[in-house]
């Protein structure tokens, strides 16, 4: 909850679709992409865009972009611009490296020697400044402040040994991956192909789904053996609403070619020897939707395990467990289960108070929490309450909630946080306040309970978070018959905890 209030957000979601079989297809590709992006709306609310093609010509790209939410950017009229299409990619954005304006909207489209390419990017390059200078020294002009344009222009560069008559897109993609180690999950569209690419550290998520026939309302006539198309997405949560089933993840460093015929691995670019993968651990903590699947496990299950681990590390004498609706609910349920305490709702959320709500005066601004939440005082009056939250960033959001609960009759209010303190900015795709703004780096942190008005405050340890995330992964890998093959492809299990520990997976270049 606090993350949402304070602007700590994932900045992008990517989604692609390609129809299988005979073209022109009967599959409504633009509509599928739009619905896929709606499923990723939590990853970016500033702008959105879709690029489609009939696949017959590398020049026949149709583009529509706009500022705002998906349902504001795309309607019946704007979708008409994207027909007739057999494949396409889309993007929803929350800015980090580029300012929020239309020219930074993705996907980016550029003309190359071998036709147009469209690129959608989730992540943030750790060496963007150097790459920007390199391109400019080669006479390449840049029209936006987004580092995603750097990726597009680097792909347009002809790599060494490429014949002018044919484009070696795998060589171009590998050239890009050699130029920048992280952070990116990419969709690249050229003519009749979509390439799905994940950086060697696997910092940002990317997965593939298979579109299957919908059948009738009772499920009759549904043939799961038939493939109507392929989709690729930042999160698997976008698959159900479009009639797709989860197929698999794109592995760290993998270059996948998706065509109307099949899904094919073209190459896997390795990390430096000894380096573990570095999937962002905060995807599990907060950013992803709870029904998404990462590394073979559902996000909801991981959050619940975090709550159970928090109960082991930080038990407290109390009467009930609750949460601030609603991202920390799985952790709160896990905490309650482990402690043997009842889970009880103490707040109800006004869902119609959005991020863009205008605060006309100081009084209403100070009443922001009361405006957003209703109090279920009959559930906790005279009782000791444990509130589970996903994070405390600055401390000025949870404090009014504690005050509200006390004024409504809570005897005690204990705060338990289902993640460790955030101490460092991300620099790899998450918009986090400056180091000085984070409560964990300020003097108030040494007496945080008193500062926010709680009876006690305890965070989950870094070790506890990592073990909660990796427990299921390790157990599954131990049972896999193909363990040796799997290890050779993806290497050691690892997760990026840079915002918690300052230990970045690669050296940052500024």
UniProtKB/Swiss-Prot annotation:
[4Fe-4S] cluster binds at residues 280, 426, 496, 499. One of its GO terms (molecular function) is metal ion binding. GO terms for cellular component: cytosol. It comes from the Eukaryota. Residues 1-11 form a propeptide. The active site is at 12 (nucleophile). One of its GO terms (biological process) is purine nucleobase biosynthetic process. Pathway: Purine metabolism; IMP biosynthesis via de novo pathway; N(1)-(5-phospho-D-ribosyl)glycinamide from 5-phospho-alpha-D-ribose 1-diphosphate: step 1/2. It is an enzyme of class 2 (transferase). It catalyses: 5-phospho-beta-D-ribosylamine + L-glutamate + diphosphate = 5-phospho-alpha-D-ribose 1-diphosphate + L-glutamine + H2O. Its EC number is 2.4.2.14. Keywords: 4Fe-4S, Allosteric enzyme, Glutamine amidotransferase, Glycosyltransferase, Iron, Iron-sulfur, Magnesium, Metal-binding, Purine biosynthesis, Transferase. The keyword Transit peptide does not apply. Catalyzes the formation of phosphoribosylamine from phosphoribosylpyrophosphate (PRPP) and glutamine. In the C-terminal section; belongs to the purine/pyrimidine phosphoribosyltransferase family. This is Amidophosphoribosyltransferase.
